[in-house]
Amino acid sequence: MHKICVIEGDGIGKEVVPATIQVLEATGLPFEFVYAEAGDEVYKRTGKALPEETIETALDCDAVLFGAAGETAADVIVKLRHILDTYANIRPVKAYKGVKCLRPDIDYVIVRENTEGLYKGIEAEIDEGITIATRVITEKACERIFRFAFNLARERKKMGKEGKVTCAHKANVLKLTDGLFKKIFYKVAEEYDDIKAEDYYIDAMNMYIITKPQVFDVVVTSNLFGDILSDGAAGTVGGLGLAPSANIGDEHGLFEPVHGSAPDIAGKKIANPTATILSAVLMLRYLGEYEAADKVEKALEEVLALGLTTPDLGGNLNTFEMAEEVAKRVREE
């Protein structure tokens, strides 16, 4: 029995998560879904965007499936990542047949350090009209995120990928913080002589994910850079509606679509569930359910290729109808 903490959150989270639950139930696996609250609505009602009982539920479950955060995102999803110590944010970038993309051969993963950098939340107003933010980079956090990235590249190499890790940084300007980041990257790389290691400045990397995305395998970077880079990368494979993510730590896993709460379309049942379904695929693999994960991804690929999609991808199905097309194919497997 897999015990899953389900947090729908705000906006379209209340649609894409239930739609994804349809697909998970179609696998026939023994799930216990434990629902918890977080986000703008619960904040307005209780004064807490992330209630203690939600934190306790998340810590008690085998994994967390999260929908979307609104205005309280920093107090919800960012805080939850820190509480669960999910230090690695995995954001796959993959082109799917039937979806307009930059190139059909795009298939790489961005690994973002999830606990440090400018998202550490250390800010202050030191004088009227003057504010500062502190960027934190530590050797310990660098070592564990780089080992995670190299281990991922090793696993992908077994599946026929190149076996390469690219580090994106700005060490030429941020000489101390990114200087340390780059130094530890190559130190850890020495432990993986079967995996190629290279580095690019983040500004150049931002160009390369558009001009030559097919050359990348695993890209590793710091918190803010990873957040920006991965959203841009999503634009090359169809947009945020197809961008899943996993937040992985030594003891916990938190899975969420990259997109936000999209209040402009919330309640209309037209939100694309693909990113959340793909996040659930990552969750299934995290739980060791590889066969079920492959079934769901294959079913989703078929649905996308046939154009059985929501309006943003040119289809005419609603959120739940698209999810049911996936679920139906999973059941038929």
Swiss-Prot record:
InterPro entries: IsoCit/isopropylmalate_DH_CS, IsoPropMal-DH-like_dom, LEU3_arc. Binds 1 Mg(2+) or Mn(2+) ion per subunit. It is found in: Cytoplasm. SUPFAM superfamilies: Isocitrate/Isopropylmalate dehydrogenase-like. Pathway: Amino-acid biosynthesis; L-leucine biosynthesis; L-leucine from 3-methyl-2-oxobutanoate: step 3/4; Amino-acid biosynthesis; L-isoleucine biosynthesis; 2-oxobutanoate from pyruvate: step 3/3. The record marks 119, 170 as: Important for catalysis. Its main location: cytoplasm. Belongs to the isocitrate and isopropylmalate dehydrogenases family. NCBIfam families: LEU3_arch. This is 3-isopropylmalate/3-methylmalate dehydrogenase. It comes from Methanocaldococcus jannaschii (strain ATCC 43067 / DSM 2661 / JAL-1 / JCM 10045 / NBRC 100440). The gene is leuB.
